[in-house]
Amino acid sequence: MASPRKEGNTAVLTKVLCSELDRLNEEFTYYHLYDMNIDGCIACRRCQQDWSGFNCFKNDDMQQIAEDILDSDIILFATPIYSWYCTPPLKAVMDRLVYGMNKYYGETKGPAIWAGKMLAAVTTCGYPPEKGSDIFEEGLERYCRHSCLEFAGMITEHHKGYNTVFMDSQKAEHIKEFVQKLYK
């Protein structure tokens, strides 16, 4: 989860998502990215020399995230949309993954070691989704094509203003239906 606010709108939706995964007896690992040490990618390409895994030389929390992704079937990103894209910690994760998981950038072009996995996203934004999160969704679609991942969709819930209540039963139902669609 890539929200700086642990009780914010994205966090509330993520709690519903996790509850639904529990109800469906799906195993998952939850990360709050703002609590983690994740450096940005520097495009050094050292990870390209070894195709056996993620293999970034940086000694931070990204190695564990990458290992868990390699052991998973579905990758779920949850982020508020700030300035039409994900928050900085998720962008750092995405940049590190695109190099470490896609062995395309070395002396010899290698495989996408995470090919075939599904990727989906849950987002919140202060604009209608077609004007607030559409650019991020397009970015995820391209990211998935490039990485040989299956883009399984994105759900965006709109917050209509700071003086309004965000969460309601309709939003909770949307998240539950989204999770059920992913895991059927």
What is each PLM-predicted segment?
Residues Y105-A152:
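Short, glycine-/small-residue-rich phosphate/pyrophosphate-handling segment
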Residues M1-T79, S83-N102, G106, K160-K184:
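N-terminal beta1-alpha1-beta2 submodule of the flavodoxin-like/Rossmannoid cofactor-binding fold
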Residues G153-H158:
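Beta-strand-loop-alpha "switch" segments that mediate conformational coupling across diverse proteins
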